[in-house]
Each structure stands twice: as C-alpha cells, then as structure tokens.
A protein has these predicted regions:
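Alpha-helical assembly-interface signal, strongest on the long, hydrophobic N-terminal helix that forms
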Residues: 2-70
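Short, conserved structural patches
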Residues: 52-161
C-alpha cells in the first residue's frame, strides 16, 4: 500500500497544471473573440460615420476621414478605440446614379465609404495572428455636400471651406 501512495505523489499538481492551462486558453480565446467583434463593430461604425459626414460636407474637405475615424478635426493618427486604424484605411468614393465614380458636383448622387487594408492582430502572448478585415462598406445618398443655398458657400464643421 505504501508503494502505491508514493507513485501517486504529484499527480494533483500535474492535473491542476493541465486544467489551469486549458482554462486560461479558453479564457483568452473568449476575450480575443470579444475584442475581434468589438473591432469589427468599430470598423463598421467608422464607415457609417464617414459616409454621413461625406454626404453633408464638401467633397474636398480633408477632415471627413479624420472625424469619421473618431478623431477631432485637424488632428491625425490612429483611431482612439482600435490600434492600426487611421484615416488612410477609409476609402471615400462619390458615385453617380449608375454607381460609377464621379467628381462632378452636380452628378454626385451617392457616397460610398470602405475600410481598406486593415489588419487585425491578436494580443494573445506567443500567438501572433494577423487577420485581414472583411470589406465594410456603407453607401448613402448625398444631401447638401456642404452647400448652403442662402449664402452660396460650402461649409462643414461650422467653418467655410
């Protein structure tokens, strides 16, 4: 009986280590999945915000992708919510009634904004995976494009451009 008890010394420690490893692996996977869903939501919201701004601001206004990316007008840099997302990842297209790109003010009927070249990186230690974001696209009909009929000027964010 004494010999059997000596052979089982340390089995609890090994079992705890295996179960602990699996528990933390599942915990990190759940956290990473939540972070991925949050990132996808922010990407979709960025396209929606940018398309909304592009439909009511002049087509040459440089702050549209900056503000659509959750930053202040005139600033630049990464999105305040997710890393490696900046205004260069937002592609703004002005479309005519047929869906073709145009830059003629009177022909613009729609605004399309897409997320391009965004790479999602995991934060799990020792597991560095990079995922390309799916295509997030928002298309909205144009509104004023910043034109104020009473004054004949173009304005956005409270300032004339």
């Amino acid at each position: 009986m004494m010999k059997l008890k000596q052979l089982q010394h340390g089995t609890t420690t090994v079992e705890f280590a295996l179960i602990g490893f699996l528990f933390f692996l599942v915990l990190l996977a759940v956290l990473e999945m939540g972070r991925l869903m949050f990132t996808w939501n922010i990407l979709a919201e960025s396209t929606r915000r940018t398309a909304r701004l592009a439909s009511v601001c002049p087509i040459d206004h440089g702050d549209i992708p900056i503000v659509g990316n959750f930053n202040r007008p005139g600033s630049s840099g990464d999105n305040n919510f997710i890393v490696r997302m900046n205004e260069a990842n937002l592609d703004i297209d002005y479309l005519d009634s047929q869906g073709d790109e145009t830059s003629t003010f009177t022909d613009i009927d729609f605004v399309r904004v897409r997320v391009v070249n965004y790479e999602y990186g995991t934060i799990i230690p020792g597991l560095s995976i990079s995922l390309s974001a799916p295509t997030f696209t928002t298309t909205l009909p144009v509104e004023s494009l910043g034109f104020i009929p009473d004054t004949g000027t173009f304005e956005c964010f409270g300032s004339a451009s």
